[in-house]
Amino acid sequence: MVTWYGAAKHEYRLTRFGHDFPFLNADMVGDLLVLIPKSLNDFIAYVLDYDEDIEELQSALGVESFQNWGVYQNGVARKVESEDECVDRLIRESFGAFGDFPSGEVFSETARQVLQKCLRNFSELPPDEALMRSIETEYQLFQFVERVVCQNLVAGRLFKDIDEFIQTALSILNRRKARAGRSFENHIEYLLTQAGIPHKMRPALGADGRPDIIIPGEKAYFDLSWPEDKLFVIGLKTTCKDRWRQVLNEGRRVQAKHVVTLQQGITGNQLKEMQAARVSLVVPRSLHNKYPEDWQPALLDVQGFITNVKQRLASATN
């Protein structure tokens, strides 16, 4: 049953599953539930488990489901709360005249500029909140530009054959997949720079691979006199139920790794695996309540991670 809690919570809830409902168990934490209406009272439900399946669906529909649920119609989110008028206006002013997609860096920088103009205290926000606001606003920017550019590309067009149609569709899907990861990387890099933390994005470490970030940089990594506990090898994963293991083979000089993620919860068993592998999870504070309650104290938020890094680097130079 779907129930509207308007007075207190201002949200819908799915209720009355019963104690023997097969999906009410800890192993399903972080999965994606998709409901497709057949009629007003009859829905088809899909539960997606693997990262690849979740990202494939989101890319195909042109949606992103981090932080909250959403209702989508014709690929456009129908939000319960109205969009901020200032953000909406600046999005249109920034990209209304674009005939093609700008670079990922331009998207990210523009999103932050919009927030700086529309939110009086944006520069004072904690890193966790600044990260989530920036990612959400950039997603709005991307949606607007995609409609402007791709609508002209496909609306009313007669494709000469199936291959041309598939090629066009794949181009749109691949752009959506790549954009989310680049957005995440760009905003994390900005936060590190703002915090004054030296770092290198995607350094080439030879046989030790190419991690997403190394702190303070390659020179310190290859300097065997530099203390290992003052080195940080970081993986950036928008989803990490499976992909967190990739960081284990990167920057192998550093045994204790960090993974920064937007993953909305994973199981206690997976968190035990991470702990055994000496991988610390860094999750924006607003997403901590998506994780098993007994594991939440073990999670780092972005602010805590930045503080920890700065303290360790400061002791290395003293």
Stretch-by-stretch model annotation:
Residues 1-24, 217-218, 222, 232, ...:
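Polyanion-binding interface signature
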Residues 66-116:
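Glycine- and charge-enriched low-complexity intrinsically disordered segments
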Residues 189, 199-318:
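Catalytic core segments in nucleotide and nucleic-acid processing enzymes
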